[in-house]
Amino acid sequence: MNLKQLSLPELEAALAPAQPSATAVRKVFAGVFAHARPTVDAVALAPQVPRRVADLLRAQAEMPSLKIVERRQAEDGFVKYLFESPLGGRIEAVRIPIFEEKYVVCVSSQVGCALACDFCMTGKLGFQRNLQTWEILDQVMQVRAEADRRVGGVVFMGMGEPLLNYKETIRAAQILSHPAGFSISGTAITFSTAGHVPAIRRYTKEGHPFRLAFSVTSAIPEKRAKVLPIEKTHPLPELIQAIREYSEARRERAMIAYVAIQGFNLEREDAEALKAAFEGIPIKVDLIDVTDPTGKYLPPTAEELSAFRDHLQILKAPIARRYSGGKEIGAACGTLAASQYGGTVLPTPAASPRQA
């Protein structure tokens, strides 16, 4: 049994032959995630873990880990981790500083990505495989182990489309938000999706406490299809309806991610298309400057973005510009591609100053 892979109910079932109490199961679960005990033996030796449970753990349990290949720090404090998995493939996670208070960890959910968004470097890798739950969680665990402040949020905005790895990412989020797990608020966990409509509807129906961010980028279908091929499979009207259902079920504004591209999607007609598409749906819009190392797509000029924000006032919705940091180390939105360049290579810490 892989202790990093199991939710609390799954762990209870796996330990059933040892007839543990609910307290003992919770102690094992907390030992793995909340207290980050590094080995099976360390978990087995935790207080209130009975001998029969400890014996079962030593006989059957394992706790695999990702290998940190490299850490790179940008001038703005963003740190990109390059991991190698024993199951094959390399993935990246980003430690994002939030003022002086906490970190948010941006995690990957797949090795590569099948969606091939035209401005995204991950999509150029193609799809290799889905990550298992433990591989997702271990990204957070290893970043947390080296952090000098608490990890207060997780965003599934790294490599891959999280809703195409639904079971594993949802289980990971459930463990992240569990009080005996990572104890991260469900509202501080966000899944970014390019618009996989069946998974969005499933998510809405199941009523999870986590948040979705919808990558729209253009409300003009012909424009959207040029940069987001998923538009051809799940057309904008279907996506808009799924977003409407999500917003109504949660009684909150839907977060619309809009990648701002110079000379492409920042005209008055683009704002008017957004207004028409989301009529009657409460939304908030996050503007994100495109980061494309190939140079095919350029970020907006200051004048262009200012004018577009003025155009967006017709939405009567909150508009924010999301900072996409770590550009020189390939840590910005859309640039994760298991690359090694730029910034400062950080040594392996001699100690673990983590604040759990």
PLM segments and residue spans:
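Auxiliary Fe-S-binding modules of radical SAM enzymes
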Residues: M1-I91, R244-R253, V259-A356
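Short linear Ser/Thr-Pro motifs
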Residues: A74, S108-S109, S192, S215
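Generic beta-strand structural signal
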Residues: V79, I91, Y103-V107, L115, ...
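P-loop NTP-binding catalytic core
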Residues: L87-P97, E101
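Canonical Radical SAM [4Fe-4S] cluster-binding loop centered on the CxxxCxxC motif
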Residues: P97-E135
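Conserved alpha-helical substructure of the radical SAM core
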Residues: G123-G153
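Short beta->alpha linker loops
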Residues: L131, G195, S324-E328
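Conserved AdoMet/S-adenosylmethionine-binding subsite of the radical SAM
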Residues: R144-G153, G158-R322
